[in-house]
Amino acid sequence: MAWIFLVLLYGLLKGSRALAKKKAMATNSIMEVLLSYTVISFLLVVPQAKDAGGMETKFYFYIALKAFVIFVAWIFSFNSLKRLPVGVFGILDLSRVLFATFLGVCFLGERIGLLQLTGLLLVCAGLLMLKFKLPVFRRIFLLEEPVPVPSAKRLPASADVTTFYVVLALVSCLLNALSGFMDKILMKSVSSSQLQFWYMLFLVSYYVIYVLVKREKISLSVFKNRWIWLLAVMFVVGDKALFIANGMPQSRVTVMTLIKQSSCMVTILGGHFMFKEKDTAYRLFCAFIILAGIILGVL
């Protein structure tokens, strides 16, 4: 049962990171936030360097590959976010759940029982309801109607370009699911300290190379942004918990994926109290459906 609480901790910290990232982005650019909190996170795991040696050579390559997968996933995600309507991302969380479940069942031989399948369907339903509000729920929860954008103010968009960035966004979700799958495989042969130290070292290296090649401007004032420091601490603690959970033989990728969706509870409450977002009652209703799915999934 310990792995369930570790993954739950990861999920709650993941939701908190989303709030901290939004706060951090109010002051600094996307790349400044990504690079600085990755560098700070690496500095926080440097004390683990003494326990990070002794791996077979092939595992350095595998961890470098995992770091590259996440590096590409984040680049794809942020590029697509800049160019697509917000509504397009309604299926993103859902697609991550489906991708991770597919990998766990097909490549790790995990089985989905009736309760797990019911839990998966409830989680998917809750996530979809968060993104696409049906008229009946608009009336029950007194939700605000979306304000239509006049056609004259809409930005012209090429269908081919839009399709390209939709594919980029979905590939990003697939890569994130693949990273979780790789964690489960790697933790059978390496320790959490080894994986976290080398993963962070490779990830920082990729970002430094990217910034140098693209000649991105990074202001040193970014290190005065307290949200970035908080983001780094939550990133390190959350990943450590997730790596340890992956190293436990009884943990299952399919169930872990459901538990990670607990992050939505944090983002909903944080959005209400920190950013004064509306429709909180409806979002909590959706969150409880997701929570019910998570509970069924771990039974």
Please place each PLM-identified region on the residue numbering.
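Juxtamembrane helix-loop-helix junctions in multi-pass membrane proteins
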Residues: 12-40, 178-202, 250-255
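Membrane-interface helix-cap regions at the ends of transmembrane helices
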Residues: 41-58, 106, 128-138, 144-155, ...
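Juxtamembrane helix-loop boundary signature in multi-pass membrane transporters
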Residues: 1-8, 98-174, 281-299
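Loop-to-transmembrane-helix transition segments
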Residues: 2-9, 36, 46-76, 93, ...
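Hydrophobic residues within alpha-helical transmembrane segments
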Residues: 5, 9, 36-40, 65-68, ...
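Structural motif at transmembrane-helix junctions in multi-pass transporters
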Residues: 26-32, 76-92, 188-195, 240-262
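Hydrophobic alpha-helical transmembrane segments in multi-pass integral membrane proteins
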Residues: 42-52, 100-116, 171-188, 234-251, ...
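Alpha-helical transmembrane segments of compact multi-pass small-molecule transporters, enriched
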Residues: 39-44, 92-106, 202-206, 238-241, ...
